[in-house]
Amino acid sequence: MSSFKIVVRKRRVTDRVIVLDASAVVAAFFDEPGADTVAEQMSGALMSAVNYAEVVAKLVDRGIPDSQILEVMAQLDVEVVPADRDQATIAGLLRAETRAAGLSLGDRSCLALAINRRGVALTMDRAWASLQLDVEILVAR
C-alpha cells in the first residue's frame, strides 16, 4: 500500500480561482513532480465532482483502504462543484478541440468548470499546454 499526504501552502500564482484536475490532486497526494506547485494552489480551489470521483478511483486503484480515502478526501480544502447542464455542454463541445490531445471526459470537465468560472485549470498533463482554448491552463509538471 502506498502512503500519501496532503500538503497545503497559501501562496497563489494568480488571484483567479484555481480549478483542479484530478491529475494535480493525485500528484499532490503522492508527492510527484510538481506537487509543490499544486499544494501552493490547492487551498480554496474548485474541483468538478467528476474530477473528485476520478481522484477517489485513482486511490482505489492504488489499493488505499476505503476508510483512508474517505478521511483524506474529507480533509481537502477545496469546493467540489456538482456538474450541471452548462458544464456538461461545455465539456461535450470541447471534444472537437481536444480530441487530438487525447483529453478524457474528466479532463474536459475540469476545463469546462474553469471556463464557466473564468478560472485557471491546474493539471499535470503536459498535453494540455498545446491546447488553444479560451481558458488559462497551468501545467504544474
Q: Residue spans of the language-model regions?
A:
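Short loop->beta-strand "edge-of-pocket" segments that line small-molecule binding or catalytic clefts
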Residues: 18, 44-47, 76-80, 120
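Acidic, PIN/NYN-like endoribonuclease modules and their adjacent C-terminal/linker elements
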Residues: 1-13, 17, 111, 115-141
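Histidine- and aromatic-rich ligand-binding microenvironments
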Residues: 20-21, 47-48, 103-105, 125-126, ...
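Active-site neighborhoods of divalent-metal-dependent phosphate/nucleic-acid chemistry enzymes
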Residues: 2-7, 81-122
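A general structural signal for well-ordered alpha-helical segments in protein cores
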Residues: 35, 52, 66, 88-91
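Short, well-structured N-terminal submotif of metal-dependent ribonuclease cores
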Residues: 1-47, 59-71
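Alpha-helix capping/helix-boundary segments
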Residues: 24-25, 51, 87, 109-110, ...
